[in-house]
Amino acid sequence: MAAWLVRMSAYAELHCLSNFSFQRGASSATELFARAARLGYRALAITDECSLAGIVRAWQAAREHQVQLIVGSEIRLEQGPKLVLLAEDLEGYQNLCRLITRGRRQADKGHYRLLREDLQQPLAGLLAIWLPNDHGDEQAAWLRERFPQRLWLGVELHRGADDDARLDKLLALASHLRLPPVACGDVHMHARGRRALQDCMTAIRNHLPVSEAGAYLFPNGERHLRTLEALQGIYPQALLAETLKIAERCRFDLEQLKYQYPRELVPAGHDPASWLRHLTEQGIARRWPNGASAKVRKQIERELELIAELGYESYFLTVQDIVAFARGRKILCQGRGSAANSAVCFALGITELDPDRTNLLFERFLSRERNEPPDIDVDFEHERREEVIQYVFTRYGRQRAALTAVVSTYHGAGAVRDVAKALGLPPEQVDVLANCCGRWSDQAPSAERLEEAGFDPQSPILRRVLALTDELIGFPRHLSQHPGGFVISEQPLDTLVPVENASMAERTVIQWDKDDLDAVGLLKVDVLALGMLSALRRSFDLIHALRGGKRLSIASIPSEDPATYEMISRADTIGVFQIESRAQMAMLPRLRPQKFYDLVIQVAIVRPGPIQGDMVHPYLRRRNGEEPVAYPSAELEEVFERTLGVPLFQEQVMELAIVAADYTPGEADELRRSMAAWKRHGGLEHHRERLTRGMLAKGYEADFAARIFEQIKGFGSYGFPESHAASFALLTYASSWLKRHEPAAFACALINSWPMGFYSPDQLLQDARRHALQTRPVDVRHSGWDCSLESFGQAQPAIRLGLRMIRGFREEDARRIEQVREAEPFLDVHDLGRRARLDARALELLADAGALRGLAGHRHKARWAVASVEPQLPLFAEGTAIEESTVSLPLPSRGEELLSDYALLGTTLGPHPLKLLRGQLKARRCRDSRELAKLGHGRPIRVAGLVVGRQRPQTASGITFITLEDEFGMVNVVVRHDLAERQRRPFLESRLLQVEGILESSGEVRHVIAGRLHDLTPLLTGLDVRSRDFH
């Protein structure tokens, strides 16, 4: 034994599941590899079941802790054996990816199905560990044929009462079948202490409480990484030594993956570099008809040289091809993010930021030192993005194109709900407990909140629920589909990563998260959806149909229009892109944008980075002349002049590091990435010494260097790229101009593009009416599916509500109404039902929505008329209506009309609900929104209104903005975190809210700082008014 103790200096665990096995493994790869390193393991195989979803994270953890990673997967064949497959080399890895892909593609999302015939494919490079059941001889013969000289019999012992007998039986079987036995741990957790969580996850996975899951639970906590000494006491020496022989054979590393971008876009006679240059030159001629400036030419040459050096030409060509397809289909699109720093992207038509008008920092997008590929995000109209997605699938085929996965992780409410169910709490308690987490929380509920909900925080069962919830938060829950991140490859994707079915038909998704792609050098194209692009395109269509002439576009909108900036400065921005939130609207009268770059700052300044870095107030004071503008040096003046000496953008931090601390551009980008990750992973402190040393060497004071570093930390993961803000500001200006000069078309387009933005159609229509726009009701004689414009010579046309406004009404019914109405107007309800082939449900919806007023009278009459319409059967399709005697029916009351409007349309063109309640609100001494302008700062006030939105910006103060609406306008309410905690029910659930507080007034900006909340929802008596909540 003593000799063996000397020899037993290492071990390789060959069967281990991480938490990426989704509710099986109870430890992360980081935890597993950290413990494996402490215990002296030589290697650790991550073998999640039919999945490589967590293998990139495992690879990173293995490198961090210097323990060899063996890439593998556990699989179970239908009516066949259970195997652990390990990749010996690159060929084995590729075969494993193909096998997992086949299993996943043959089953619904979240499942897999593998049969024996699926293992008939070549399996070279894969080692197999067989975990035998009762059909040993037959299975072994078949497996030996599939894995010649690459098959072992796995022996898994977990200190069970029958371990000795089990070991003897398995060794006898191995000898009989002439298979080498090997020790395996079937590891599900890094340490024994995770057993309770592992049991809980098993119960969750099987939809049972732990108390009823005994058949599925492990009998003890031995499925953890055990010490070498413990393993020696369990397994014979030969079985442990065999693990190291297998580990020695498994030399595959993810670094061996060679990813190539598609090359078929390059025509004959060109290579990717020459074709990219050709397209760029074409773009230069189009973008600058009179020739590009020397500055732009120099920038483009520098970019093309670096793109060629790093081998990314095909990537740029692919994005350009996708954008060209969209533009050819007249789908509005625009690149954003760091790609807007690229003059080549502008020339190719991918982005819209003219490098002649902006200060580009290309290294924010691409640099030699940066160990990650470029990332180009392109927004498309949200209603037409699917056309672009299907184009990509058609162009490259399912084998070479797939969407990126997003790892959905457990958050507070979901974790506490699943744990509480598993521990057997009654359903009603589970719901209350989950609600205690709050919709914005990523933590288990606090003791105070539990007490408020009627729980005893010291209860043993509750303490157990909370302890397990804390462990479960952050664990992967399932793979979901990225909104539009594509991976496209020259070779079949399943030679790089497994591919599985997405939840949506006609889509496939790789098993890796978008963040994993950068680590292994895979390039992603983001085909994203943006509702504002749909709204802008609809606006242009409506204006062109109404006024004729040359079609308006984003590029042709008059620039730097004073009337537009005057409207923005008044915070009259409901519906406007990026500056419609209450936080943005509160800032607008203070910043008062007067030119385009002011909008770039406005978009970026109401963000957690500038706020937490204490940059907002200094900038505003300097802008308003309340504080002198000072620069620590002339060279930094060039960096910060555009933001009055205050760093607001990521690019400025990078430029500061380059100019003031002698960072290379690539080092500066590494600083940016460290900023983005430090709150989650640390890693920023080493820049403190580097930055300080560099700044001191350049003559800057130590306290200035310390202050700059603290501001960088304040940016944290929230620092906003200037290029991103500028791309968004283009859309901000375009939507602002439309709201100012074509308000009817803009409002109509917003409603037709909904859901999008902060405001519901009801709030958009209320805003339109406050701007004196005429709105007309839904009417089958005039309405189409979409809302439309009707003009009779007025400066601004009226908005006719479309049939899409009627909740539950089918688009196909609306299209038939439009089609048959073009031939001949409807005579009455019977004629409508017959010619448009409407069933009783559709006619009843039209009657209840008031859409039959022109054919049958008010709602009561219309409902009576609908009741007399015979069902539309083919035999009677051309028959006549049954004559009904005239019946006298009373007019609906105003209250009835209001209730019906909101129930069917979600809005009303009649009196605002609060106009009907104003008498009761006056009795409660509630002021209306008009009166706020006449009251002084600091005055106690009481207001009430419909809750139309809750917004919680990611700021240090934890406040929430609640927007109230009455018949005259909006009231902005600021709710502190402590008040929201104390009055959670009215804060979260009220639809009609009364607020007692203090009026805060600064210039034209007014808020009510809430001191007490009262839920007046019962006054609405069934009115269905819904808020739009954001965080």
Curated annotation (Swiss-Prot):
SMART domains: POLIIIAc (SM00481). One of its GO terms (biological process) is DNA replication. Its main location: cytoplasm. Its EC number is 2.7.7.7. SUPFAM superfamilies: PHP domain-like. It is found in: Cytoplasm. It comes from the Bacteria. Coiled coil: none annotated. InterPro entries: DNA_pol3_alpha_NTPase_dom, DNA_pol3_finger, DnaE2, DnaE2/DnaE/PolC, DNAPol_HHH, NA-bd_OB_tRNA, PHP_dom, Pol/His_phosphatase_N. Keywords: Cytoplasm, DNA damage, DNA repair, DNA replication, DNA-directed DNA polymerase, Nucleotidyltransferase, Transferase. Signal peptide: none annotated. Pfam families: DNA_pol3_alpha (PF07733), DNA_pol3_finger (PF17657), HHH_6 (PF14579), PHP (PF02811), tRNA_anti-codon (PF01336). It catalyses: DNA(n) + a 2'-deoxyribonucleoside 5'-triphosphate = DNA(n+1) + diphosphate. Disulfide bonds: none annotated. It is an enzyme of class 2 (transferase). One of its GO terms (cellular component) is cytoplasm. One of its GO terms (molecular function) is DNA-directed DNA polymerase activity. Belongs to the DNA polymerase type-C family. DnaE2 subfamily. PANTHER family: DNA POLYMERASE III SUBUNIT ALPHA, ERROR-PRONE DNA POLYMERASE. DNA polymerase involved in damage-induced mutagenesis and translesion synthesis (TLS). It is not the major replicative DNA polymerase. This is Error-prone DNA polymerase.
